[in-house]
């Protein structure tokens, strides 16, 4: 089986904006004399996602036409499905050094030169359009809204040319062994003979409800891609290295190895709920995935979105417009009566019988120094979590 037999990337072509060899040497030399844009952690995540093709069909940060079209219609100006504008925001003093038709060097906050952008547009950041469209709220308490409001007032649009995506400022967060680009996962799926692949997105350790959804999807697909997000998340989320240890542990003990893959997605969380669910699905399509698990309040935060808004939003697209198939799962819970995971579709509701699980509840238990019970987490995963929580508590005592 060849990788070209897999699902077509969003927009039809898998983008690659990495520059190698002599071209890279020339770009580094040129960058030394260019104005500089220092990237935030979120922007560095976006740069990587564009460069490796995960954000295909984007070849760079969006210009004003795409920005407006994405905000109003969840499609780029040419009609390709895309729900969230990927922007490069700068402050006034940086904007003053830039000009349309020129170029700028993009550097990480640690000083690493990451690439160069061709400046095709400089335009005002219309947060009055973006916030209610993308986040369905302008509440500054929403972490995604807050992140946008803290960005610069000007947006730089244009294609990018990327030299590196993994500066060495946080080597423990890079997970090189599991950091596969879309071209790599597609090759791996083809080598394994997987024609249908389900992906599970997570920013939390996998608890029993997650495991249930994953295994339901494995019954209908050739393989499962556990694809945790390891880019920028909000304060309070369990660190990526701890989560990765949890994923490796549960796969080792409770999943079939030759039907399961673990790779990381280096994207930043936006907490945009329904629109981010569509983004996550399209990104997984670029990775070669055919089915995407969408559970309760996917990519949500607080009470900003309805329980199944992230599932219903897919109905706003025409049949076939989005290549990947959303797997819309009901809220799963542990049933004492059934002694296993159930949903409203699989088991009758009995008063006081079901224990509903969430990553937030697991974190609350850990903060209180309590071990997550077997109904919440597999014991091997609970061991990892309680060891981390104990060490963290000791460090802050």
Predicted feature residues:
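Active-site cores that bind ATP or allylic diphosphates and position pyrophosphate for catalysis
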Residues: 1-397
